[in-house]
Design a protein with these regions (language model features):
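C-terminal binding/interaction regions
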Residues: 24, 28-31, 35, 92-153
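Compact, glycine-rich, soluble single-domain proteins
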Residues: 64-78
């Protein structure tokens, strides 16, 4: 059975309110925290949850899904993005990412490139295991990116 860490959710909620995040971003963070609970990570035990906010206001959740062959593993960020894209999402406004770590968990290089594919001005909300948040952007995490605009110019 799924066990939700309510204390963790409450701490994240309080930190977000104190940071004056808008209500949709609060929902996004809560969705990422909930998604982490479904992580399939029997090899690394490194659970990650993510949630995207599409430009039209929809939220899609994803968790990391490991595979014994490692290369077939899918990160939480890409799971959430691919879920949204498979439902018609063409651009992303924001993504929230959380793990069980005390430090903030940043998206890997592949995930940064995939995020950039669906938005060059994406807000990135990182949440640690204390419920503290850090705001970033895809421009900050992937400067001078190779994007679809590069090919279309």
């Amino acid at each position: 059975p799924l066990e939700i860490n309510w204390e963790y959710l409450l701490r994240a909620y309080i930190v977000i309110k104190e940071a004056n995040m808008n209500e949709r971003y609060t929902e996004l963070v809560n969705a990422a925290i909930a998604a982490k609970e479904f992580s399939y990570s029997p090899y690394s035990l490194f659970r990650v949850g993510a949630a995207i906010l599409s430009e039209d206001g929809q939220i899609f959740k994803g968790c990391n899904i490991e595979n014994v062959s490692y290369g077939a593993t899918n990160c939480a960020e890409r799971t959430a993005i691919f879920k949204g894209v498979s439902e018609g999402v063409k651009s992303i406004k924001a993504i929230a990412i959380t793990s069980d770590e005390e430090d903030f968990t940043y998206p890997c290089g592949i995930c940064r490139q995939v995020i950039c594919e669906f938005g060059t001005e994406v807000d990135i909300i990182l949440v640690n295991n204390k419920g503290e948040t850090r705001m970033s952007s895809i421009e900050e995490l992937l400067p001078s990116s190779f994007s679809k605009e590069t090919l279309l110019d």
